[in-house]
């Protein structure tokens, strides 16, 4: 919950910046805002699972729906390291990738600071890659996540006083999967797409 609220708060701060900040900052908002419905669905599914527990098929169904929302918002795997993915295959490949990233981070959440630290490393990697490729919207969309993870890591590091839970770890993995795909769309490199898992 704290991580999700921190990310939303950072997006809100960007919205409230004075006009003197210019269109440079505003350009990054569409990425974060387009992904907000999908991210919120993943978060609330994880939250319900933390509180009440969900059956695996229920979680999978909701995660696939969230991945579909992200695909509709523009997160579409069109190529992998220069290999063009046929249009008819783009949706299932994207769904598989995003659900896989979300659950991969969920699996490593058992050790204090591991998922948060890996998430921060992957976020910074994508941020640097976006800056080097002049992908300003993606760079600005990753900054709120990097800030939220950095602030959370202080309390999640050993000995942890707060934990990500399913709501946090699933959301981090899902967002990083989305950001990796968006990076690869510009650079056509496998590094961008696999950054979340390489962390």
Where would I find each of the regions flagged by the language model?
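Hydrophobic alpha-helical transmembrane segments
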Residues: 60-76
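Hydrophobic alpha-helical transmembrane segments of multi-pass inner membrane proteins, especially
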Residues: 37-41, 45-48, 67-70, 94-101
């Amino acid at each position: 919950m704290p991580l999700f609220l921190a990310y939303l708060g950072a997006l809100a701060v960007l919205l409230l910046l004075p006009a003197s900040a210019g269109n440079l900052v505003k350009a990054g908002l569409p990425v974060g805002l387009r992904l907000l419905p999908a991210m919120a669905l993943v978060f609330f599914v994880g939250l319900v699972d933390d509180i009440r527990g969900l059956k695996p098929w229920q979680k999978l169904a909701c995660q696939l729906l969230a991945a579909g929302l992200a695909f509709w918002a523009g997160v579409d795997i069109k190529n992998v390291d220069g290999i063009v993915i046929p249009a008819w295959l783009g949706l299932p490949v994207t769904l598989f990738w995003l659900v896989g990233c979300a659950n991969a981070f969920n699996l490593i959440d058992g050790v204090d600071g591991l998922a948060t630290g890996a998430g921060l490393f992957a976020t910074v990697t994508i941020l640097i890659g976006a800056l080097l490729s002049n992908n300003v919207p993606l760079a600005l969309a990753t900054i709120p996540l990097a800030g939220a993870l950095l602030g959370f890591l202080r309390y999640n590091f050993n000995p942890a006083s707060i934990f990500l839970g399913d709501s946090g770890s699933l959301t981090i993995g899902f967002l990083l999967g989305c950001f990796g795909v968006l990076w690869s769309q510009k650079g056509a490199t496998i590094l961008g797409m696999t950054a979340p898992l390489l962390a």
